[in-house]
């Protein structure tokens, strides 16, 4: 059996590239700062809808923000 794939992200890099704080990004996409922090640290995987909203907010393609390891 293959090892389980883990969804990872480059959210922090994309956010800092846009000079956004966690709070500012959270407000922009309609979630809490804690949610953004949890996604960035890998403690929480966003729903497909939230992942796409983050992509739009950061002007990134899905595969630029999220990847499997």
For each feature predicted by the language model, list its residue ranges.
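Short alpha-helical DNA-recognition segment
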Residues: 19-38
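A short, Lys/Arg-rich alpha-helix, primarily the initiator
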Residues: 1-17
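Residue-level signal for the short linker/turn that defines the boundary of a DNA-recognition helix
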Residues: 9, 20, 46-49
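Short, charged recognition helix plus adjacent turn
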Residues: 1, 66-69
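Short, conserved catalytic or interaction motifs in soluble domains
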Residues: 41
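DNA major-groove recognition helix of helix-turn-helix/homeodomain DNA-binding modules
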Residues: 49-64
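Alpha-helical residues within the helix-turn-helix
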Residues: 16, 27, 56
């Amino acid at each position: 059996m293959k090892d389980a794939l883990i969804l990872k992200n480059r959210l922090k890099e994309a956010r800092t590239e846009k000079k956004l704080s966690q709070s500012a990004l959270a407000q922009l996409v309609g979630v809490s700062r804690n949610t953004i922090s949890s996604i960035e640290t890998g403690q929480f995987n966003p729903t497909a809808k939230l992942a796409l909203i983050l992509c739009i907010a950061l002007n990134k393609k899905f595969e630029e923000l999220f990847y499997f390891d």
